[in-house]
Structure formats: C-alpha cells, structure tokens
Amino acid sequence: MNRIFIFILFFFSFAFYPGYAQEKHLDVGDTIPSFSLKDQDGNSFNSTGYKNKNILVIYFYPKDESAVCTKEACSFRDNYTEFTKAGAIVAGINQASVETHKKFQQHHNLPFLLLSDPGNRVLKKFGVKNKFFLTGRETFVVDKTGKIVFRFDSFTKGKEHQEEALKVIKKMSQ
C-alpha cells in the first residue's frame, strides 16, 4: 500500500510541476535572448538577424500534427499575408526535428518558419512553462528593437494565438 501511495505522490508531483530548469519567464518589455536554430529546410535562423528589420511573431507549441497545434499553425497560415503586409516574420518553435517540421510544413502548406529546438533550449530561455508532461504553448510578438510587446499564453486555444498576435501587429503598423 505504501508503494502505491509513494508512486501516486511521485507521479502527481511531476504531473503538476510547471517545468524544470527554466529561466525567468519573459514578459512584455523584456528583450528576447539571442538564439540560433535550424528551420524546416536546414537553414540557420538567427534572431539577431531580424533586429531593426522585422517584427517577429514567435510561437512555441508542443507537437507537430497534434490537433490543437495543427489548428494553430493553419490559423497562422490562413492569415500569413496579413502578417507579411505588416512586416512580420512568423516562426513556430518546438523540439521536433528538422525533418519532422518539413513533413508538417508540406502536409499543411505552411508558408512560415518552423524552428527545431532540440532539448527545448530556446523555450527555456523564454521561460515557457510545461503543462503537465507537454511543452507549453505561448506566443510572443517582438518589435524591431527586440523587445516583447505582447505575450499570449493559452494551452488549449490554438487559433486564438494567431488572432491575438495579429491584432497587436495591426495596431503596431498603424
């Protein structure tokens, strides 16, 4: 009986733990850390290369091809021209491989960057917290100076990430 109790206690202590080894949660007004990741084509994406040039929309999501993540990605796809008209670069990030991202991109005709973050190194730099055993889902809008101007955190509302980010970007471009 004691073993069962200890197992249950151990299981739930990790199930509800918000994350591990994550840095400070970045918020509005913070400068994003510099990072470099490979995109779905194997090309390097360096965050500093966009400073003073583009607005960045960086969205972290748990898994390619899962229901909510696919809905989120397709929502960004369906409104991609609105983002590009405002001078924004959209980048989805998770720990999937370059190859997995390429398949996801091709399957859903995604026109934006999908960045591979092995070990969730960049996710941790942003302080995105895990939800249960899954990677967190958060979207950051970053202005041309590298400062976060908007952060949206909702694990179950994939489509709303795009909607909220687009509202902010439209206000920025007025």
Regions found by a protein language model. Give the residues of each.
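Positively charged n-region of N-terminal signal peptides that target proteins for export
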Residues: 1-4
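N-terminal "domain-start" segment that seeds a small globular fold
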Residues: 20-48
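Structural microenvironment flanking redox-active thiols in thiol-disulfide oxidoreductases
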Residues: 70-108, 119-124
